[in-house]
Amino acid sequence: MILGLSIHGMLLHYYGRMIREYKNFLNISYFQEISNLVCGNEFAWFYNENISYKNSNNNINEHGFSHWIVHPNRPDGTTMYQDYFMPLLLMIKDCVKRNKIIRARVDMTMVATEKFVHDYHKDFEQENIAAILYINETDGETIILENETEKIIKPEVNKLVTFDGNISHTGCSPLKNKRRILINSNYE
């Protein structure tokens, strides 16, 4: 188990309604462990017909892969990699000053042949803070819709983005990179 890690991230941007970006959120050694795990050939990915939402519009680019770390219906844990991820989730929980991890999963979207914006969605209707930690070098942006204005967040390796989870948001499939990998989590 990895213990005793500290947050090294620096607050880069603060937008309205709690949209925040932290560059180099994790220390290099811990981030590299997580990156090697989820980008490696042995990590267990599970196929989703629509990575953003349960209902599918049958668009060929909606699909993706995920791996649950904390499932909302199984809060005691759902992965054999719990020891790798729990320190990270606890650090984010402290960063956003919340008491509970509602859910967390690793997500991967694949390269698209043309620009593809996934479905806008809210992870939960209840009050929560959403967090995204970017794992790999990629070009698939995150778009957060605030007051009908799109805030475009460019992915950077080891950058954490936190925001009000009641805001509609989405991601874009990469065009220049084979895949976009991130850890998405929510806290109340």
Residue ranges and their predicted role:
Residues 3-5:
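Short hydrophobic targeting helices and cationic amphipathic motifs
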Residues 9, 57-58, 104, 158:
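Generic cytosolic/nucleocytoplasmic N-terminal low-complexity/intrinsically disordered segments
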Residues 74-188:
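Catalytic core of non-heme Fe(II) oxygenases with the double-stranded beta-helix
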Residues 12-99:
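Non-heme Fe(II)/2-oxoglutarate
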